Amino acid sequence: MICEREINVVEKKLYHKQDIRLNYYEIKNDLQPLVLIHAQGVDAVSFGNVWERLSKRYHIYSVDCYGHGESLHDAARYNIVDISKAVGSFIEDVVKEKVYLLGHSSGGLIAAYIASATELCSCLILEDPPFFSSQGERRKGTFNYIDLSTICHRFINQSESRDFVLYYFSNQYAWNFFPEKSREKVKQKLTGMAAEYRKKHPDKNLKVMFWPKYALSGFQGMNNYDPLFGEAFYNDSFHSAVLHEDILKNIKCRTVFMKAQTNVSEEGILLAALSEEDLGKTAGLIADCKIVRFECGHGIHIEKPKEFVECLLSL
């Protein structure tokens, strides 16, 4: 069913129960509930560009994970079990019915855990989650590990900089994609521009002239990101020793896997969430899994919003 009436406003709310604290955004209507779980580093507003269009078909709930946005910041809780329990409790107490559950990247790992451990999910949508590639020794050969995870690890073990947003921008792996001859000059200039913007607008999302818009989307909400969350992926404590295989084989609901492009660097670094082999293994373990491919990078809802929305409206 597609709702053709005027779209309701986005409401920002807080779910607080005992030691659970989740900030979330809601677009109310009487349609199928859709809970959105964002990737690490950004916040729930990462999905803001598709909220309105999705609300024609769904009652939208977009949640800040622990360590992000205005949800609980407690490093001891930055793991798949605690976050999944919190979101599960939110669904039980706030939504109060079975949901369509969508998770992007690390949010996809969380969504999958909820679907495997509870009866709260009637349809699971996985937006390019890093199954198998982000766990154990495999994680060390991925873009996320050499980029965000390692930068978080270095940031919390230094004392010169307090601005993680600027620290990440100046140390990100993306500089390696610039021509070696001009790399340092360009890096110095753009980092200077970023520093100036941070000085003038410390509470705003980072903007840097000439930096690609889709790349800047990765800084959405980074002001409130706790680098200790990235440390949990650096040392693999995020998974709480729960194997991806055990999560996937217990998912019984209908599942859609949104797969972005797969790229590998000359050095063998996986410049993607997961490999084609990982994808095959993932889909093979889920009882009912449909794969939908997108010709874009990891942020499908950012780079291909029209196709992303069309996929969800067709479910």
Task: Give residue ranges: language-model regions.
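Hydrophobic, aromatic-rich cap/lid helix
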Residues: 185-246, 262
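Active-site loop/oxyanion-hole signature of alpha/beta-hydrolase fold enzymes
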Residues: 65-102, 106, 113, 137-138, ...
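Short glycine-enriched nucleophile-adjacent loop
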Residues: 108-119, 124
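Post-His helix in hydrolase/transferase enzymes
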Residues: 302-314
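Conserved loop-alpha-helix segment in the C-terminal half of the alpha/beta-hydrolase fold
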Residues: 247-295
